[in-house]
Amino acid sequence: MKRSLLALLVLVGAVLAPTSAEAADGPALRVPEAALDAALVCSGDVGGSAHNPILLIAGTTLTPEVFVWNYGPALTALGRPFCTVALPDNGMADIQVAAEYVVHAIRAVSAASGRDVDIVGHSQGGMVPRWALKYWPDTRARVGDVIGLAPSNHGTVVASAVCRPGCAPAFWQQRTGSAFLTALNSGAETWAGVDYTNVYTVLDEVVAPNLNDHGSSSLHTGQGRISNVGLQDVCPAHVADHLTTGTTDGVAFALVVDALTHDGPADPARLPADACTRLLMPGVDPVFLAVNEARMATVVATQVALYPHVPAEPALAEYAR
């Protein structure tokens, strides 16, 4: 059963409003609270589970609907409560604004559950939690894992060519060397108490280059525990591209489950012996796979083609300068 986080918080007696100490811990959120509440939807017993709730965050161009036919049913089968947060404009707008939705989601889900929140994000969805953790320090004590599937932690060289005639704000910000990513990755990339798993594929045609653990997705600095895992390092002949890594891939899912069920980030050495034979993750119905992938591709293509272009990267917020 799905319900808004606002309803869940009322049921468990939690409050969305931060304490005065929390209000001072990071910049005030500019997005109206009603919009933040409306973007957050949960499934399962978030308030009563013995497990950390999972926050699913989709990538640029996509919405939480992308999880309905993969991670949603898979996590339900595992008995894991989860929530989704819809980033504004399918994640195409200013990522600094999208980060406020993530901050609110972390605070609200943690308050509703009384537990840490484990984040699983694809592409931008695997990177934007790091902006939340960097600039809203109170969120760090509320997060257990950040699991990025083909995350755009250091951007992509592909965006530079795409943005020459102008492009969506989020594309500008995910260019390698953008002001946004320079700010994000200045200083420590990770934080103590948070475990970071970054799953990448050498066949990633969107977040590139990703040929090894010094590629676009990987992290190396800070006090968080980090695991950068190449799918082809686990399974040398494995075929997975950018979209499938975050939506259907069986090996990526096995790494997600390993991170969620152990202390610390994912460890490929713990994967089942038959992990490389699992082409599709649980929850994906092979009968409807082609239809669901076609729908996803249509959403991506429509957003890329029709979302309004801007001539330059959005200015950094004052708190990030």
What are the language-model segments listed below?
Residues 1-23:
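Secretory targeting and sorting signals
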Residues 25-31, 39-116, 290-294, 299-318:
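Active-site catalytic motif of lipid deacylating hydrolases and related acyltransferases
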Residues 41-43, 162-168, 234-236, 275-277:
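Sequence contexts marking disulfide-bonded cysteines in secreted/extracellular proteins
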Residues 55, 83, 147, 197-199, ...:
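Hydrophobic/aromatic beta-strand patches that form the interior of the parallel beta-sheet core
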Residues 58, 85, 96-190, 206:
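Serine-dependent carboxylesterase/thioesterase catalytic core
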Residues 75-76, 134-139, 217:
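Short, surface-exposed basic-aromatic patches at helix termini and helix-loop junctions that form
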Residues 87-88, 115-119, 265-273:
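Surface-exposed patches in mature extracellular/periplasmic domains of secreted proteins
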Residues 192-321:
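C-terminal catalytic-base region of ester-bond hydrolases, centering on the histidine
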